[in-house]
Amino acid sequence: TGAVFFGVALALRPEPGGSVNFEFAEFMTSSIFKVPVSLILIAAVVLFVWIPYRRSVLGRAAYAIGSSEHAAYMSGVPIARAKILAYALAGFLAAIAGLMLTFLTYSGAAKASLGADYTLNSIAAVVIGGTSLFGGAGSAIGSIFGAFVMRTVGDLLIVFDINPVLQPLFVGIVLLFAVSLGSLRLLRIKNKLDLYR
């Protein structure tokens, strides 16, 4: 589906276009009492979006669906509503990320391909932060920590004068390592459960 939406974006606007309010972009990329506005925005999302969602019935239902949709259905979990809310929140947060990227570039004339590099990085960040690709585990705090780790890796590549072209290779290696650790943990749990059968 990502490729479909990418194609639609290119069809709607093959050439960059648009503008952004300079003063607003300046504010969103500035600091308040030496704290970056972007960091305040992350804290606001965690406090006012993630924590209420995590403690709500539909939030817990999303975790149950991630662990086992069939078991969640048999337990009477409202699967359809939980999925709709999860996807709506994902779209809302992706829109905020897109706006922040627009503010960072000080231009609404961004190309459709501008955010393509963030796809792998965002997946790597949440996996490093403890979110399981198999579902049922993860947190906003862990994902933020994973994003800081990814940013640190990127900065270290610059410090050690490594070719930026090789950055996706290192990101891929980190992601592979993180996924492998998660898979090993699940394999250990499965083996322990098999012992009691």
Go through each PLM region and give its residues.
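Transmembrane helix-bundle core of multi-pass membrane transporters
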Residues: 1-56, 82-85, 104-115, 162, ...
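Alpha-helical transmembrane segments of integral membrane proteins
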Residues: 37-41, 82-89, 141-142, 167-170
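Membrane-helix/interface signature in polytopic inner-membrane proteins
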Residues: 48-88
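Short amphipathic alpha-helical coupling elements at transmembrane boundaries
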Residues: 25-30, 61-64, 70-74, 155-158
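Transmembrane alpha-helices
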Residues: 78-103, 120
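Transmembrane alpha-helical segments in multi-pass inner-membrane proteins
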Residues: 94, 109-171
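Hydrophobic core segments of alpha-helical transmembrane domains in multi-pass membrane transport
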Residues: 2-10, 41-51, 87-98, 128-131, ...
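Cytosolic-side transmembrane-helix boundaries in multi-pass membrane proteins
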Residues: 47-48, 74, 78-81, 104, ...
